Amino acid sequence: MKFQENVKNAHVSGNLDAPEGGFDAIMQAVVCKDEIGWRDHARRLLVFSTDAGFHYAGDGKLGGVITPNDGICHMEANQYTHSTIQDHPSISLINLKVKEKSIIIIFAVTQSQHAVYKKLSEHVEGSSSAILSENSDNVVDL
């Protein structure tokens, strides 16, 4: 029940272009142990929900951001502080950090994005992709 309540009360963010900065969010969720509250001996499951594609390493050049993602925590007051300082993380960096931190990612995505995230899940060890209904009412079932 607590999980369902937390999902209903989750903060929803957006982006100005079609692809999202979800990789930045994933990286911070994975590496910010204390800020997120990951416990030492818990099973770590990260559900990433979206209806859009993603930005990855190299896309930051379009906005003049060329410093590679360093894969460390940059959160203050629950806000990511380096979105204009460093590029989005690469798929390989996300995979490395997910393996280091023993985190399982479920990409809960809409039908239109499922093929992309299914392919992505093949490159992020232990992750999987599932289809999220258009109104997200099946997220708890995933």
Language-model features, listed with the residues they occupy:
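Divalent cation-coordinating acidic motifs and surrounding scaffolds
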Residues: M1-L142
